Amino acid sequence: MNYQTIAYNVTDGVARLTLNRPERLNSFNAQMHEDVRHALAALQSDDTARVLVLTGAGRGFCAGQDLSDRTVAPGTERADLGASIERHYKPLILALRRLPIPVLAAVNGVAAGAGANLALACDLVVATRSASFVQAFARIGLLPDSGGTWFLPRLVGPARALGLALLGEKLPATQLAEWGLIWRCVDDEDFTAEIDSLAAGLAAAPTLALRRIKQAVHAAWHNTLEQQLDLERDAQRELGYSADYAEGVAAFMAKREPRFTGR
């Protein structure tokens, strides 16, 4: 499919989705929502994809909502922002979280508003040292959406979550990596190589195990310890019968690189 606002392809097990409105810092309009929704639906049914890399074109990752888009811009008739969230952002965040494969956010510049929370919805967030994050909502009279009020306190605690949300300060990715909000920062000149290396490594990893790891960590946010122990038991039982486990042990004993198939 020819997309108007994104680039999407799958090569060697790595799916890449690039938000492609660099002149607007890759902010979302109605067309971009449609394009991303279609790409994620295609990804769901693509058995060759083993990892998704989400990034932005140009100097920004994503500036959130394009406020000039007529569907959300204030005018004579006030736009229903709740309807926009229900139609676009809620399905987007849930679709990302529910993907069975690892999702890697490659934050190459500013991540603002819903764009920041789009990154936080991913499993791994790697940013350039020059990148920045800002919860810009309060500056225009709104609250963090796209899961912001859910992700922030869980990742950095209520004190820092409230500071980020109430003050709307732009903070460097280096500081947020120190806080544990994102996985790591990488020198700008090494960023592309680092993302490619991480993506290739995840694509070559035991897919079924990664899927169960992702599910278990997400479930831990609401499970009791006993429920989590039961989940680990059931998942480990399944993985213990997998071809990838047999291959992993055989490769370890033979001192060779494993060749995982995702089975």
Residue ranges and their predicted role:
Residues M1-A57, L94, T192:
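Conserved CoA-thioester-binding segment of acyl-CoA-metabolizing enzymes
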Residues I6, L94-L210, R237-S242, E247-A250, ...:
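Crotonase-fold acyl-CoA enzyme core
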Residues A41, G56-A95, A111, R139-G141, ...:
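Glycine- (often His-adjacent) and acidic-residue-rich active-site loop
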Residues E86-I93, A199, V217, L229-E232, ...:
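Hydrophobic alpha-helical core bundles mediating ligand binding, dimerization, or RNAP-core interactions
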Residues K214-N223:
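Short, charged, surface-exposed hinge/linker loops at domain edges
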